[in-house]
């Protein structure tokens, strides 16, 4: 009887050890599945607040971003509602409307924002980074398989406060550091439009 009990205990321990060793593989598969789902998410909106800190200035803005496939519209307003800028990409054309209502066009959204505001905002990477995707950059995962951080060229992105939204697990806090700037994006609301 004692031998049978020992064999049963040993079998249970081996079974548990086997489950523990397969966990990282299952996590990796789940990350790949979630990554594929997020890559297919191309129509969404968000609203929140952004703090912008450089050596020369500190600022904050309300953020409204609408993504429609490859096209987007980014509105930044002051905390009291004053228009700062509206940046849009439509059919490959980038237009920025400044705080006086003047339109500016360029092929480089980041350079255009910097020229008019002095802010380095990595617009090219934001549609992916905002959703918790690393693009082609180096990245690290949290234990729960959400994106922890991304290093993309001169930018380091650190993620936090993931929440479930319409079947997706989306970040609500991003801290982006690079090009002499630190941006902190607090997302208050996600809307999945398709």
Swiss-Prot record:
It holds the Pfam family LolB. Residues 1-18 form the signal peptide. A lipid is attached at residue 19 (S-diacylglycerol cysteine). GO terms for biological process: lipoprotein localization to outer membrane; protein transport. It is found in: Cell outer membrane. GO terms for cellular component: cell outer membrane. It is a lipid-anchor. Gene3D superfamilies: Lipoprotein localisation LolA/LolB/LppX (2.50.20.10). Keywords: Cell outer membrane, Chaperone, Lipoprotein, Membrane, Palmitate, Protein transport, Signal, Transport. Monomer. Plays a critical role in the incorporation of lipoproteins in the outer membrane after they are released by the LolA protein. This is Outer-membrane lipoprotein LolB. It comes from Aeromonas hydrophila subsp. hydrophila (strain ATCC 7966 / DSM 30187 / BCRC 13018 / CCUG 14551 / JCM 1027 / KCTC 2358 / NCIMB 9240 / NCTC 8049).
């Amino acid at each position: 009887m004692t031998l049978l009990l020992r064999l049963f205990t040993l079998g249970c321990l081996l079974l548990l050890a086997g489950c523990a060793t397969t966990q990282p593989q299952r996590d990796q598969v789940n990350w790949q599945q979630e990554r594929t789902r997020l890559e297919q998410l191309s129509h969404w909106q968000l609203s929140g607040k952004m703090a912008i800190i450089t050596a020369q200035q500190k600022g904050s803005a309300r953020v409204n971003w609408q993504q429609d496939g490859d096209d987007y519209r980014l509105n930044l307003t002051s905390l009291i509602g004053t228009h700062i800028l509206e940046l849009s990409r439509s059919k490959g054309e980038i237009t920025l409307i400044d705080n006086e209502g003047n339109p500016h066009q360029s092929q480089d959204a980041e350079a255009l924002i910097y020229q008019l505001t002095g802010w380095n905002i990595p617009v090219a990477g934001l549609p992916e980074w905002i959703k918790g995707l690393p693009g082609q950059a180096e990245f690290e995962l949290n234990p729960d398989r959400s994106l922890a951080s991304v290093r993309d060229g001169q930018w380091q992105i650190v993620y936090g406060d993931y929440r479930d939204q319409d079947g997706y697990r989306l970040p609500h806090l991003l801290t982006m550091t690079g090009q002499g700037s630190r941006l902190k994006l607090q997302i208050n609301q996600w809307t999945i439009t398709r």
